[in-house]
Amino acid sequence: MTQDSIIITPPAASHREQPTSTLVRIMRGICAVLPLDSINSNPWDVWEAVARARTYAVDASHKHSSIFVGQSCLRLLGIRGWSQNPPVTIYRDNRICTSSLPSCHVGSTTVPATSVSCSEFPPLSEERNRIEGLVVEHPYDALVRCALHDEPLESFVLGCMALNIWSQFSMFHQDECRRRAEEIRTELIARLERAGHVRGYRRAHAILKTIDPGCANPAEAALLWLVRSICPFTVKTQVHIGVRGHHYYIDILIEDLHLIIEFDGVAKLGESRIELEQAKREWVLRDQNLRDAGWQVIRVSWPDYDDWEQLRIRLSRVLGPINPAPDCRFLWKLPTQRCDGPLRRFYSRTPRMGRKHSDR
């Protein structure tokens, strides 16, 4: 029997002050010290910590350094996509292979198994960065890679989250932030153009043209992805509306239809029972004020994401019998189990029998 190697996983920014640590077996021969309390940590924090630890474990398992590419590069930068349990993606010269990573058990939480994928596609440029000792491709190259090769839902969400962070988006200083975002978008599209009209080009171009820095989290970005895939009208995010002395910032606004579409997440409602009740009263008042001002308000919550086709039908009925803009028709593709299955994210309830995913 060989003794396991132990790696120390650098904590994500939100856990820098966490004094407690937990030892977890990540893969054969390698354990990691996770910067969290196995008893009191939320399951999603455990999944995030294990995802980071797996990246470092993969690097430690190779004699020669690998280049972490695509989503793995972006996650090291704190940019989260739709999948909460993504594969680790690397590039190594003349290597194309996929291997498995076992499930991990932290307290009462089990993080499902995933994989290590050795990409056949080399980085778009020779630019390399180093993040906490790991070699990565340029972050812009990583996002272009995702737009070309990942599923539309995943790459769109990653793109929105990347623009949000890279532009340092603030709803109170939107002009400056959106100017920075457009400069970044121009560079992203230029890198895509240098890659040539390769397979996936049209979809990647549509994604990079429509991602928006105004999405505060992956759930809002996923909602915007659906809306943009079916709506030909101008769609805006984080729009300020003043009603009766109240100031509201709208997740998604379609002015031509006088329509507001918003995501209701747990974080918006508070944590304690008192905060929850207060938040509910404020949401009721908010909705009433917006409707009295002539806006139609549509709300979407986590359970709606359990059935993408049904949610898309619901939104299509609200938007009316219209066709999406030509480029935006490339945005839609029903997510597969590899992107959206129960091994990849949390569900609001046990997935129903027959819940639809694309086979490929």
Question: How does the language model describe each region?
Answer:
Residues 1-13, 17, 178-360:
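Surface segments flanking catalytic/ligand-binding clefts of nucleic-acid enzymes
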Residues 1-197, 320-360:
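Short gly/ser-rich loop at a beta-strand->alpha-helix junction or flexible surface loop bordering the NTP-binding
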